[in-house]
Amino acid sequence: MFLMYLLVQTTESSWLSKTYKKLENSAKKRISEGVAIAILGGLRHRRSVAHQEEASLHVKTDELPSPDTVREQL
């Protein structure tokens, strides 16, 4: 029964088509945001690595361990 339902549905109203359109719109939105930020200047907000960037900004070079200390710990 479910298979017949899937076959009867048109491609415009199918779940796969709707999902594809959502992904396409999301990609278009991210691209347009990146272009706008590039034109206006400024940092681009990265969704997946934001916490890493914040953490790396607080590290100072004088706080990093020396290579000898790292070898001793190994």
UniProtKB/Swiss-Prot annotation:
Function field: Has antibacterial activity against several Gram-positive and Gram-negative bacteria. Is weakly active against yeasts. Acts by a nonpore mechanism.
Signal peptide from the UniProt entry: 1-13
Ranges where the record places region Disordered: 51-74
Keywords assigned: Antibiotic, Antimicrobial, Secreted, Signal
Propeptide: 45-74
Coiled-coil regions listed: none
Species: Ascaris suum
Principal location: secreted
Induction: By bacterial infection.
Tissues showing expression: Expressed in the body wall, intestine, uterus and ovary.
UniProt record, GO biological process: antimicrobial peptide secretion; defense response to bacterium
Protein's name according to its UniProt entry: Cecropin-P4
Subcellular location: Secreted
Any single Gene Ontology cellular-component annotation: extracellular region
Family: Belongs to the cecropin family.
